[in-house]
């Protein structure tokens, strides 16, 4: 029996056969880069999103994102709030691991850039609204980490200590 047996519920591609929608394209358009399977398990994307109300990674409910254009030092991001009544807040991180420094943002509705100067950009978008953002960034300017906007990854868990080695020498032979 092999991993590609179509009758095996644990087959490698069973999720593709059961779901009429492939999520890879959606993730690429939302994050602004290829999926992790193309780069040794690491996401090389322009953005990552956090829901500040739920304190979790990902887009808030009823909020959509589309990375419309990518250039060497900037990207154009479109956010759409499909909720008819509620304003939505989102935290946009530069890169999957916060490795990109967001320098400034120019919303289509403004004539002057807003200086950011960090890896996070806080955005609030009204009900039934679309917001177009031109975001300038310095790529790979920050040390990558698993930090979230509300918790440092290093402080979240205890670090693993190495084993203590016995320094007693072992003599082999005479």
Which stretches of residues belong to each language-model region?
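Catalytic domains of carbohydrate-active enzymes that cleave complex glycans
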Residues: 1-76, 82-84, 133
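Feature targets compositionally biased, intrinsically disordered low-complexity regions
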Residues: 32, 40, 116-117, 172
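Short, exposed beta-strand/loop patches in secreted or surface proteins that constitute
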Residues: 65-69, 112-114, 123
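Beta-strand secondary-structure signal
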Residues: 76-78, 89-91, 122, 132-134
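Surface-exposed beta-strand/loop patches in extracellular or lumenal glycoproteins
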Residues: 83-98
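Short aromatic-acidic-glycine turn motif
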Residues: 96-109
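Short beta-strand and strand-turn-strand segments in soluble, beta-rich domains
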Residues: 106-118
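C-terminal beta-strand-rich structural cap/linker in extracellular carbohydrate-active enzymes
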Residues: 117-173
